[in-house]
Amino acid sequence: MSTPNSTPSEPPVNVSYYEQCKKELHEMIEKRQLLETSLIGLEDSIYRLEGSYLEKTSGTGNIIRGFEGLLKNNASNLRRRADYSESDRLFSLSSLSSPHTRSPAYDLDDSTETSRRRKRKNESDSHEGRRRSSFREL
């Protein structure tokens, strides 16, 4: 039976309960660290494999830039390699937890769509209160 000052859902406060909770917390922290390590390894693997794919297919075509180069199929396209930018890394840079998305080179890359949007917004804000209309508003 509960007393007027306590709620029925409160567990009894004692040392064994505290030790049990402390043990569970340490187990969860260890599990989280293992999962984070595994995630970093997977993201790094995706980054390397994606770079290899983009490098091998830059002359002929790939899923990022299209396959027009495959239709042309001349010798210069087949010899050309590594013609891609960091913003072409659609898969590895889509993860917010990837260490590659937090790199300064990615943040300062002006070729990304986000950077272009940011520039346009800053430019439109500097036009003395003039508002730029879009096709959706018409």
UniProtKB/Swiss-Prot annotation:
One of its GO terms (biological process) is DNA repair. Residues 93-138 are annotated as: Disordered. One of its GO terms (cellular component) is nucleus. Keywords: Chromatin regulator, Coiled coil, DNA damage, DNA repair, Nucleus, Transcription, Transcription regulation. InterPro entries: Eaf6. Residues 129-138 have a biased composition (Basic residues). Residues 18-44 form a coiled coil. Pfam families: NuA4. The keyword Nucleus applies. It is found in: Nucleus. Belongs to the EAF6 family. Component of the NuA4 histone acetyltransferase complex which is involved in transcriptional activation of selected genes principally by acetylation of nucleosomal histone H4 and H2A. The NuA4 complex is also involved in DNA repair. Component of the mst2 complex which is a highly specific H3 lysine 14 (H3K14) acetyltransferase that functions together with gcn5 to regulate global levels of H3K14 acetylation (H3K14ac), critical for DNA damage checkpoint activation. Component of the NuA4 histone acetyltransferase complex. Component of the mst2 complex composed of at least eaf6, mst2, nto1, pdp3, ptf1, ptf2 and tfg3. This is Chromatin modification-related protein eaf6. It comes from Schizosaccharomyces pombe (strain 972 / ATCC 24843) (Fission yeast). The lineage of its organism: Eukaryota, Fungi, Dikarya, Ascomycota, Taphrinomycotina.
